[in-house]
């Protein structure tokens, strides 16, 4: 993350320097917690290209998607960027943060790629 004009955003220069291997998992908090950045579609597209180009998996924690306080910003699920990215993506969501339901025990993972869903289920056992 980098701070520019009072807003945190992706540091794509730093991302390019990361040592990654195909199949590695990258965790994203979207919108970002604790800084609250709701990424723009342009930022998400650029980030998606980086994920796909390196053949990484992306786990996007979008539990705060309903807690965007900036009326100018909107949440856009990163898996909706492209069908290609969706194949690499695990999206995590739950009502507990937004609706003050801690202890409710209701969360879910959206995984459109069947093989990735199988890997996720095995990892959860």
Where does each model-flagged region fall?
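Nucleotide phosphate-binding site architecture
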Residues: 65, 79, 117
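Conserved core segment of the aminotransferase class I/II
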Residues: 82-125
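Substrate-gripping "pore-loop 1 plus following alpha2 helix"
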Residues: 72-76, 86
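Active-site phosphate-binding strand-loop segment of PLP-dependent enzymes
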Residues: 3-73
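Short secondary-structure boundary/capping segments
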Residues: 17-18, 81-83
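A structural preference for long, well-packed, hydrophobic secondary-structure segments
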Residues: 75-78, 108
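Hydrophobic residues at beta-strand termini and immediately following loops
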Residues: 1, 78, 92
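A conserved amphipathic alpha-helix that caps or lines the catalytic cleft of carbohydrate-
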Residues: 51, 79-82
